[in-house]
Curated annotation (Swiss-Prot):
This is Nitric oxide synthase. Keywords: Calmodulin-binding, FAD, Flavoprotein, FMN, Heme, Iron, Metal-binding, NADP, Oxidoreductase. NADP(+) binds at residues 1028-1147. Gene3D superfamilies: 3.40.50.360, NADPH-cytochrome p450 Reductase, Chain A, domain 3, Nitric Oxide Synthase, Chain A, domain 1, Nitric Oxide Synthase, Chain A, domain 3, Nitric Oxide Synthase,Heme Domain,Chain A domain 2, Nucleotide-binding domain of ferredoxin-NADP reductase (FNR) module, Translation factors. (6R)-L-erythro-5,6,7,8-tetrahydrobiopterin binds at S103, W444, F457. Residues 776-1021 form the FAD-binding FR-type domain. Residues 491-511 are annotated as: Calmodulin-binding. Constitutively expressed at a low level in the larval fat body, hemocyte, Malpighian tubule, midgut, silk gland and adult antenna. GO terms for molecular function: calmodulin binding; flavin adenine dinucleotide binding; FMN binding; heme binding; metal ion binding; NADP binding; nitric-oxide synthase activity.
Amino acid sequence: MSNFFKICCVKDPGGSAKENLRKMDQVNGHFVSATCPFSGESVELKVDSNQKQVKPNLRIKVPQPIRLKNHVAHDENFDTLHSRINEVTHFNTKCSEKVCQTSIMDIPGRGDTPRTAEEVFKDAQAFLTQYYASIKRENSEAHKARLDEVKRELKERGTYQLKTSELVFGAKLAWRNATRCIGRIQWKKLQIFDCREVTTASGMFEALCNHIKYATNKGNIRSAITIFPQRTDGKHDYRIWNPQLINYAGYQEPDGSITGDPARVEFTEICMKLGWKAPRTPWDILPLVLSADGKDPEFFELPKEIVMEVQFEHPEYDWFKDMGWKWYALPAVSNMRLACGGLEFTANSFNGWYMGTEIGCRNLCDESRLNIVEAVAKKMGLDTNSFVSLWKDKALVEVNIAVLHSFHRDNVSIVDHHSASEQFQKHLENENKSRGGCPADWIWIVPPMSSSLTTVFHQEMALYYIRPSYDYQEPPWKTHQWTKSDGTKTVHRKFHFKQIARAVKFTSKLFGRALSKRIKATILYATETGKSEHYAKELGTIFGHAFNAQVHCMSEYDMFSIEHETLVLIVASTFGNGEPPANGVDFAEHLFQMLYNETNNNRGDGTSDLGSGTFKTPTPKSLMRSNSMMTPSFEYKRQLTRLESNKSSVAGASSIEQIGPLSNVCFAVFGLGSSAYPKFCHFGKTVDKILGDLGGERILELACGDELYGQEQQFRAWSSKIFQVACETFCLDENGMVKDAKKALGDVPLTEETVRFGKYQGDTKLKAALEASFRKQLITCKVKENKNLGDFSADRATVFVDMQPETEFKYDPGDHVGVLACNRKEIVDAVLERMKDVDDYDKTVQLQVMKETLTPTGAIKTWEQHERLPAVTIRQIFTRFLDITTPPSTTVLKYLSKACTDQNDAAQLKELAIDSNKYDDWRHLHYPHLAEVLAQFPSCRPQASLLAALLPSLQPRFYSISSSPLAHPHRIHITCAVVVYRTQNGQGPMHYGVCSTYLQNLKPEDEALVFIRRAPSFHMPKDLSAPLILVGPGSGIAPFRGFWHHRKHQIKNLIPNKQKPGPVWLFFGCRNRGMDLYKEEKEKALADGVLSKVFLALSREDSVEKKHIQTLLEDEGAEISRMLLDENGHFYVCGDCKMAEEVQQKLKEIMKKHAKMTEQEYEEFILNLMDENRYHEDIFGITLRTAEVQSASREFAKRTRQESQKSQT
C-alpha cells in the first residue's frame, strides 16, 4: 500500500537548495513552504507558553482504505465506502478514542428535535446525488431541477416530499446500509407500501393489516415495508407503539413470575391501560397501538386469521409438541425511524423472514425471554447440575432443530444461520465490488449459536453508519404528549379481516379509493397499428379500480425507473417478421443491455460468453431480429421463489446469486401477433424472457393473442386472469372496489348513456383532424400518373402510382410511405342507413364521453372530448377515421346484440361474442365488413356515437417506396398489388382491399394524404463497392426499383478508374411472363451495368419448368456464399413473411453446403450479418386475395400457433 499521509516539509541543512524552492520559512531547523501545496493555506508560526516556536501541523490526510481480513479464507479486501463523504451522509458512533461502545444495544440517534431546513437540504442533496447516480442521471438537468424544487419546498413549507421512486430507492438503500442485518443480500427485493396519504389511526391499522397479509403470503414470506407520513414540526408525529407488528403479551404475576413474553411486559401494561382486555394466556397476540398526527393512541386487535403461527415439534422427540411452544411466522419491526433524504419517517414497519437462531436461541432460550432451555434439558434427561455436561448447549441445538423442522413442515420461509452467514459473505463480496465497502456490526452479524463454525465469525468488518438508515428512537409512551391527563383511552376495536379490508368501515369513500391505489401498476405497450395501445388503456381502466395504474408507451417510459417498479404489465405487438414496433425498439435494447451488464457483473471479469470464433458479440437488435428467440449462451439462472430460496438451509446458500436488478418487480406479458408469421409474437416472448432472466417475478405465464384466431377473446381472458392474480399477489382480493372491477370485466366499457355526439361550433380542416387523430404530420400529394403493371386481370392487378408532394420531404430508398385511405362509399352509406341517433350525417360534431371524477363532495360527471376522434362530420368519421371493413370485434358484437329488437338476432350475435370457436369460424368464412353484419342481422339499429367509440381506427397502410430522391426529385412512386377476393371459400361476395383499391381508383390530380416512415435497416449501404443480393417476388420488387434508379445516379458520380461499384443481383419471381413487373426497366438497367444479373423464376408459365426464387438461390449458392463471406455483401429480402422464412432457410442450406458451416456457426453468422446491417428484411403479411391463399394461410397460421405453444411449454 502507498503512503496515505503526505507531509509538506523539506529539510535543507546546508541551504543549497533554497533558491530552487518557493519562499520558505524556517521552523526549528526545518524549511517549510509558506503555503501548503495541498491545501494552499499559509503557514503561521505558533509560539508556545515558553516562547518556543512550534512547527505547524501541515499533514494532509488522504482517505485511507480500511484493510479487512478473512482469517479462514486468508484473503482481504479494503473498505473505501466509509470515506466517501461527498456521496454518503454519516453520523457518528458513541465510541471515543479510548472506549469502544459498539456492544451497547442502542445505535446513536439524533433525538426527537425537528431538523432545520438547512440540515434537511444537506442530507437531501447527498441522497438525491445517490438516487440520480443510480439511474445514471447525476448532475443532469433533471437532477439540478429536483434540487431547486426541494430547496423551494423547504423555503415555503419547512419540509418537502420525496417522490415515490425516491422513497422506494431510499427504503431499499436503508436496508442495504443496516449494519446489524445479516440478510441484506435481499435488499433489492423489498415491496414498498407508500401510505403517506394516511391521516388516521384506523387508516394506519388497515394498511398494517394489509402489510401482514401480503408479507405472510401463506408462509412464503415476502419482504415489505409500509411507510406513513414523515415528521414535520415534531408535534404531529405518526407512531407505531408496538416494537413489532406481531408480539406475544407478557404479564407480571403477583408472585413475581411472568406469563408470556418477559420482553413485552411494559408494553402489555400500556395496552391494558389503554383499555385492552387481556386474556392473560401465554400466547396472547398484542393489539396494535397507533397514533396519527400527534393525537393520542388508539388500539386495534389484530384479526386472528391474518396472524400465522408455527406450532413447534421435534423430528425425534415426540414430547416436544406437547409443550405447547409456538411462534409467529412474520418478524415485522415497527419501532424504528427511517431517515432518508433529510426526512424522518417515525412510523414504518418492515419485515424480512426469520433466521432460525432468532427464535431458537434468542426468543425461546434467552434467560430474559421464555427461557425454555432448562425445561428442554430435563425432558432430554440431561444433567443440569453441572456446566461441564454442556446441557445448555445440547438443549439449545435441539430447540433450534425443532424450530427449523417446524417451519419447514409448514412451508414457512426461514433460513438457518449457516446459510445466512454464507449469504452475507456473498453480499460482502458484491458490495465491495459495487461500492467499495459494506458497513457491518460484527457483534450482531455473527449468529448467537455455533459462532466460530460460521464464515462470518472469521471475517473482519468495518462499523460505520451511513444514511439512508433505520434508526432506533425513544418508545412513544415515553415521549408522547397526552391530550388526556391520565393517559388512558377506553375505545376497544376488534375486527375481522373482511371488515378491515372494506375501507369504508373506517373512512370516507374517497379515502378508501386512495388506500386501494397505494400499489402502482405500470402498463407498457408497443404498437404499430394502435391495437396494443387500445388494449393497454383498457387494462389500465380495469386495474384503476384497485391499483395506481399508469399507462405508458414504451418509447415515452423512463427505463431507469423499471428497477423501482412494483408491478409491470406488458402489452406488446410484434412488427414484421419478429421485430419490435418502432416505439418498442429502445425499450428492447435497454432490456438487453441490462441483461448484458448484469451477466458481466456476475462473471466478475467483464467478459461475455456470447459469440465465439471470429464472430462478434451479437447486439440486442440482431438478437431481436434473429430467426428464433435467441438466448445468450450464458443463460441467466432461473430466479428462485422466496420459498425455494429460504425454506431449506441448503437452498438458502445456493440461491444467493439469483438476485437480479428486477428481483422486486412482478410482471406479466401479453403478446400480440399474427400466426401467419413464423416468428409469432416474437417481441412479446423476448420481453417476457428477459424480464424473467433479470430476476423479475412472473406472476402469470406469457399469453399470446393471435390476430387470426380469437385475439380479443384471448386478451379478455388474460386481462381477467392477470387482474385476479395481481389482486391475490398484493392481497387486494377482499377489497370492495376489486369486486366492482371484476364485475366490470365482462361489460361493454361504454354505454349509450355515456357517449354522445355533441354540438361543435367552428370549422375543422380534414387534414388537421387526421393529423390530430393519427399523431402524424401529413403530406398532401397530387397524383400525376396511375397505371397498371404487367398483364391486367380483374382479380390480379398491380398498379404504379406517381405522386407529387405539395411540400418538401425527405426519404431514402427502402423507406415506406404511409397512405391514409378511405372506406368505400357503398359500405359507408349502408352503415349510416342503420344508425338510429343521427339526422344529419354531414354536420360537424364532436364525439364526447362522460367522465366521472371523485371529489371530497361527491362524484362529478362531465362530458369530455373523445381522445381519438376530433370534430368532423359523422360521414367523415365513418369514411376516414374508423375501420368498418375488418370483421367487428367481440366487444362490438356484444353491443350490437343489445341493439337488436329481434331476440333471435340478439342471441346469435351474443353467441358469436362469447364462443371463440364459432366467432373464428364465422370470421374466416364470411370475413364480413360492418355493413354485411348489419345486413345479416336486420333488426340491429346501433347508436352511431357509441359505435364510433367502440370501432378501431382505420389504420394507414404502408408501401415500400419505389422511387429514388436522386432519380425522381419531388416525387414518390408506389408499387401496389391490388387486393380483390371472394369470401366463403370463393363463393361469397367480392371484397376489396381498403387501400389498394383506393390507390387503384385515384385519378390524375386527385389528392392523397401520406407520410414517410423511415426504415433504416433496409437502406442501401454507403459503400458502393459492396455486392447487393436483392430477393423480391411479385410486388416485393417495389423497393428494389428505387434501389437501381438510385444506384444509377450514384454511379454517375464515381471517380473513373478509382471507384468500382459492386455487383447487384436481382432475384424476381412471378406466375408468368405477363406478370414480370418493370421488365423493360430491368433490361435497361442490366444493359447500363446498374444491375449485374437478373434472375426470373416463373411458377406457372406454360411450357417452362416451374421454379421458385429459392431454387434460383440454390443454383447460385457458391457465388452468394462468396459475396457474403469474402466481399461484405448485403442480402435483401422483400415479400410476404412465408416467402422470407423460406428464403432464410434456403440461405442456411447454402452456407452449410458451400461454407461448411455447422448449425451453431450459421446462427452466429446470421447474427453477425444483422449486427453489421448486412441482412435486410422488408416483410408484410400474407395477402388473402383468393380462397386458396386464405385457406393455405390459415393452415400455416395454425401450425405456427401449435409450434409456438410447444415452445412455451
